[in-house]
Structure formats: C-alpha cells, structure tokens
Curated annotation (Swiss-Prot):
Belongs to the UPF0756 family. Its main location: membrane. Keywords: Cell membrane, Membrane, Transmembrane, Transmembrane helix. It comes from the Bacteria. GO terms for cellular component: plasma membrane. This is UPF0756 membrane protein EAT1b_0668. The lineage of its organism: Bacteria, Bacillati, Bacillota, Bacilli, Bacillales. PANTHER family: UPF0756 MEMBRANE PROTEIN YEAL. It is found in: Cell membrane. InterPro entries: UPF0756_TM. It is a multi-pass membrane protein. The chain crosses the membrane at residues 5-25, 52-72, 82-102, 107-127, 129-149.
Length: 154
C-alpha cells in the first residue's frame, strides 16, 4: 500500500510543480502496479529502463545531424571558441561522470536511494529533469573516489 501512496504523492508533486515527466512516469508506474503487471514489468524496467532512456535522449540529440542541420563544419565551428570548448569539455566530463555513476549505483543500493530522493526533490520542486541520478551518481563516485585518495594519505 505504501508504494501506491508514494506514487500518488509523486503524481501530486508533479502536478503542483507542473512537471510533466514526473506526472507521466509516476502515473505509468501506478497504472502498471494497479492492473497487476508490476511483477512482470518492473524488473525489466529497473534493469533496462536507464539504458532505454539514454538511447532515446541520444536519438533526440542526434536528430539535427540526421536532418542535416549540423554537419562536420558546424561541429568544428562550434568547438573553436571559448564557449564551445567549455561546452565540449563539460559534455565529456558529464559523460565520464555518468559512466562512473552507473557503476556506483550497481554496487551501492544506498547511493541509489539517496540519489532518488534528491532527484525527486529537484525534479518536483526545482524544475530539474530526471537525468539527475546518472549525473548525480557520477559526481558522487568522483567525490567518493577523491575522498578515498585523501583518506589513504591521512
């Protein structure tokens, strides 16, 4: 019963914060659970959902290449200036951090729970978008790695 209440609360948070992603995700999960398909679908969604989501985001990002709006010339011109260099480096950093984050989420369930809570709060009330768990886990992994290095010194 608490799962239903939690999901309903997330739908309400989504409505209050006008966050369509939270409304849709929470509603879909609530419906799947209510019609009795949770046991069949939740394990697959849990194990493959992030990968599917990353694939969909990647498709959306690559659409300008597919339409011809961005080609090699535009790509090269975009990374020549300071803003482009910072954006390029940031993209690399976030991708590397997210990769580390996926690994951390696999080995430490406590991290996943804390990240989920932070993501729900940020998405629900601060206009965030729910890519936070991957990036958040990546940043956490980098910080924890730095902490472990410092801890060895002292």
């Amino acid at each position: 019963m608490s799962a239903y209440l939690f999901l309903l609360m997330l739908v309400l948070i989504g409505v209050i914060s006008n966050n369509q992603s939270v409304i849709i995700a929470s509603s879909v999960l609530l419906i799947i659970k209510a019609i009795g398909f949770g046991d069949q679908l939740f394990p697959t969604l849990a194990s493959k959902g992030i990968s599917w989501g990353v694939t969909i985001i990647t498709i959306a990002v690559l659409v300008p290449i597919a339409t011809g709006d961005i080609g090699f010339k535009e790509l090269w011109n975009s990374i020549k200036g300071p803003v482009g260099i910072v954006a390029f480096a940031s993209g690399m950093f976030v991708a590397i951090a997210a990769g580390q984050g996926v690994q951390l989420m696999r080995v430490d369930p406590v991290v996943t729970t804390a990240l989920l809570a932070g993501t729900i709060l940020a998405v629900g009330f601060m206009k965030g978008i729910p890519v936070g768990p991957l990036v958040g886990a990546g940043i956490a992994a980098l910080i924890l790695g730095g902490y472990q290095v410092i801890e060895k010194w002292f």
